[in-house]
A protein has these predicted regions:
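Extended alpha-helical interface modules used as scaffolds for assembling large macromolecular complexes
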Residues: 1-222, 249-252
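Domain-level recognition of nuclease-like catalytic cores that cleave nucleotide substrates
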Residues: 226-252
Length: 252
């Protein structure tokens, strides 16, 4: 339907927080959000939370409960995915974000599963070039949050592409901090993976330096703690640092 096209466009350029809430929904968790139930279409571009209202009104999400908070009794809604049809609608939507680079996207997934870093770099840069600007939320977006919007969208795509082989978890506590993404194999014959994303800081001379920082962070903060607790040995855990500078990506 036409509202799906609108929902897709709004979610693609949505903030990192909103994409994280989508990840939870796809993983069949409930989320708690605040929005105005009266959708005013003119507000959709300005007020990000209006998308939740649109998703509820379209029947994709259902309200499990409402809690009224504060002096103004602001409504906070617990939302969950309505049914499997919604899961497939979201899956198709996330895939469509990378349609302009779909062949490269599939090749990237293959390279990631095979641990081929050279091919990962090649395809990831092609994907970023072809699709990066679609994640743009407009003129007011900082250079820093722009790549973040892109790679969180990328994680959502990853979530649906490899879900048969891996449980994809993101932004959770493990060791001494919060990792970006871990891929936990459903069959222990496969390697587990930790992905850390970093936007290049001005004081970093090269993207290689940014990659090294990402990899060091995985080690120092012991992000593999959760995987080891699940009985996955260290030699079966791959670490990848993704460094971003505008549309350029380096993976190491």
């Amino acid at each position: 339907t036409s509202s799906n096209g609108l929902i897709s466009k709004l979610l693609q350029s949505a903030s990192v927080n909103m994409k994280e809430e989508l990840e939870k929904l796809i993983n069949r968790q409930q989320i708690v959000v605040n929005f105005d139930e009266q959708i005013i279409f003119g507000q959709l571009e300005q007020d990000e939370s209006a998308v939740w209202s649109l998703l509820v009104a379209s029947g994709y999400l259902k309200v499990e409960e409402i809690e009224y908070r504060g002096l103004t009794l602001e409504p906070w809604y617990s939302l969950s995915i309505t049914n499997l049809e919604t899961v497939s609608m979201f899956s198709n939507m996330f895939k469509s974000w990378f349609a302009a680079a779909s062949a490269n996207y599939n090749e990237f997934i293959k390279a990631l599963l095979n641990g081929d870093v050279k091919a990962m770099n090649l395809y990831m840069n092609d994907i970023a070039l072809a699709t990066f600007s679609n994640f743009d939320a407009g003129k007011h977006v900082s250079e820093r949050s722009q790549p973040e919007r892109f790679y969180h969208g990328f994680v959502l795509g990853l979530l649906v592409e490899v879900r048969d082989l891996y449980e994809v978890r993101s932004n959770r506590e493990s060791g001494y901090g919060r990792y970006d993404v871990i891929l936990i194999p459903r069959n222990l014959d496969r390697d587990a993976m930790i992905l850390e994303f970093k936007v290049k800081e001005t004081e970093e001379k090269t993207l290689q330096e940014t990659v090294q920082k990402a990899l060091a962070q995985i080690e120092i903060k012991k992000y593999d703690a959760e995987l080891k607790e699940r009985g996955i040995p260290k030699e079966r855990i791959r670490h990848y640092g993704f460094a971003f500078e505008g549309k350029k990506v380096l993976i190491g």
